[in-house]
């Protein structure tokens, strides 16, 4: 079951990346659009579509019933591929607008795919397999894009549609496979809490109930998503690829994937949900602190391109994937929350992609001629500091909140037992 479900989820989202991210391998050198850098504008337009999908998804994913998931997947991937064909057909710069619909169609796919595997005793393993698709797929998408352009000599505008055409039928087949997964058992529900849809009132109540820690996590994730998007979309501008294989990205991301798989794999042996939350956040703090140190001391450390990219990728993805895979599933189970992981993931993504658009627009309008490496290192350094503080505070809050709720549960149990004894004595003959 684990290989079936986890493998299908991993491959499914990897193919979503094949429909969404290959264009990032192209540099579009010398192209401008409406007075702005062409690639920056393509990225902003696609993210705007993605952003709107995330906003709609806060409601849609929270309420999406299981019988409608497959229809949603099929409609999304068909629109995504059609938009890539239009990107190749239409003349630049007007083809940019096709990428808006590409982002719009794929913005909720993570939440939909995750809904197939959440709320199970095996979710930690399944989510780990699913989550690594983000790491490995990003590098593979760029490497395949470079291969198609450099070896097959396909143009920058048609390369995404060609890759998407191969991905679409495979993704439809995997969607069907996920849709055939059995529902969580009663034992799954007992250990991980039943996953239910949330209406607007319930979403607001959930946020109010955990507002301090959710604000900390949402703000920190806002910064992480911005940093990850800039790294993924502009890596070919950040580092000098001359002298390196076009498969460098895939090779580094594969090693990072194996390390994170091993780290997150240890969580399977920890039954206590609060212990898992503390361990995960501690790993995240170590990652963000390392990321900040390496970035702010880039000139002093004199690291090679490969070493720098490996450390950045590992540190960033430990933090990012923690919240995209395991954290909220354990959070729901720990505090017996009635809800689903999709609500949390779509919310943090919506907030994060909003930040990405604002940062790119600020860069384009106020500082168009920048050194991408310096820009990234400065941002990575300060993001690392802020996130280290935010996640450390989150650990303190969660531990204290859990202790408080355990005391309340113990108190209620004692009261109920006392009432039962009193009732028993009251019916005894005098």
Residue ranges with predicted function:
Residues 84, 93-109, 302-322:
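Hydrophobic core of transmembrane alpha-helices in multi-pass small-molecule transporters
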Residues 123-150, 166-167, 345-359:
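Glycine-rich segments within core transmembrane alpha-helices of 12-TM secondary carriers
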Residues 4, 30-45, 211-216, 236-259, ...:
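Loop-to-transmembrane helix entry
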Residues 149-217, 241, 270-272, 398-412:
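Intracellular loop-helix junctions on the cytosolic face of multi-pass helical membrane proteins
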Residues 23, 107-122, 235, 318-336:
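Intracellular juxtamembrane helix-capping segments at the cytosolic ends
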Residues 415-430:
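PAS/LOV and related PAS-like sensory modules
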């Amino acid at each position: 079951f684990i290989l079936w479900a986890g493998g299908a989820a991993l491959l499914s989202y990897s193919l979503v990346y094949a429909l969404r991210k290959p264009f990032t391998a192209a540099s579009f050198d010398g192209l401008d659009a409406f007075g702005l850098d062409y690639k920056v504008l393509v990225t902003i337009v696609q993210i705007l579509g993605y952003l709107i999908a995330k906003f709609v998804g806060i409601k849609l994913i929270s309420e999406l019933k299981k019988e409608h998931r497959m229809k949603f997947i099929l409609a999304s991937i068909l629109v995504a591929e059609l938009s890539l064909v239009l990107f190749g057909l239409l003349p630049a710069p007007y083809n940019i607008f096709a990428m808006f619909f590409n982002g719009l169609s794929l913005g909720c796919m993570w939440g939909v795919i995750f809904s197939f595997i959440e709320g199970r005793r095996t979710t930690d393993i399944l989510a780990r397999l699913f989550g690594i698709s983000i790491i490995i797929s990003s590098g593979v998408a760029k490497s395949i894009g470079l291969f198609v352009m450099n070896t097959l000599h396909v143009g920058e505008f048609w390369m995404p549609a060609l890759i998407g055409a191969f991905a679409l039928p495979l993704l439809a087949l995997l969607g069907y496979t996920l849709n055939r997964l059995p529902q969580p058992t009663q034992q799954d529900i007992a250990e991980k809490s039943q996953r239910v849809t949330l209406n607007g009132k319930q979403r607001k109540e959930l946020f109010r109930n955990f507002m301090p820690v959710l604000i900390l996590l949402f703000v920190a994730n806002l910064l992480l998503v911005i940093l990850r998007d800039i790294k993924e979309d502009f890596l070919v501008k950040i580092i000098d690829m001359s002298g390196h294989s076009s498969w460098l990205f895939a090779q580094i991301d594969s090693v990072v994937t194996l390390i994170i798989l091993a780290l997150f794999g240890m969580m399977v042996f920890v039954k206590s949900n609060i212990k898992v939350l503390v361990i995960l956040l501690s790993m995240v703090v170590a990652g963000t602190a390392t990321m900040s140190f390496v970035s702010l001391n880039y000139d002093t450390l004199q690291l090679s391109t490969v070493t720098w990219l490996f450390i950045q990728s590992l540190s960033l993805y430990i933090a990012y994937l923690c919240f995209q895979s395991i954290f909220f599933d354990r959070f729901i189970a720990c505090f017996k929350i009635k809800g689903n992981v999709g609500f949390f993931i779509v919310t943090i993504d919506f907030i994060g992609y909003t930040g990405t658009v604002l940062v790119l627009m600020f860069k384009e309008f106020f500082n168009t001629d920048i050194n991408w490496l310096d820009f990234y290192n400065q941002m990575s350094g300060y993001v690392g500091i802020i996130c280290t503080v935010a996640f450390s505070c989150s650990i303190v809050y969660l531990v204290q909140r859990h202790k408080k709720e355990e005391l309340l549960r113990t108190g209620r149990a004692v009261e109920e037992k006392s009432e039962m004894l009193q009732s028993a004595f009251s019916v005894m003959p005098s």
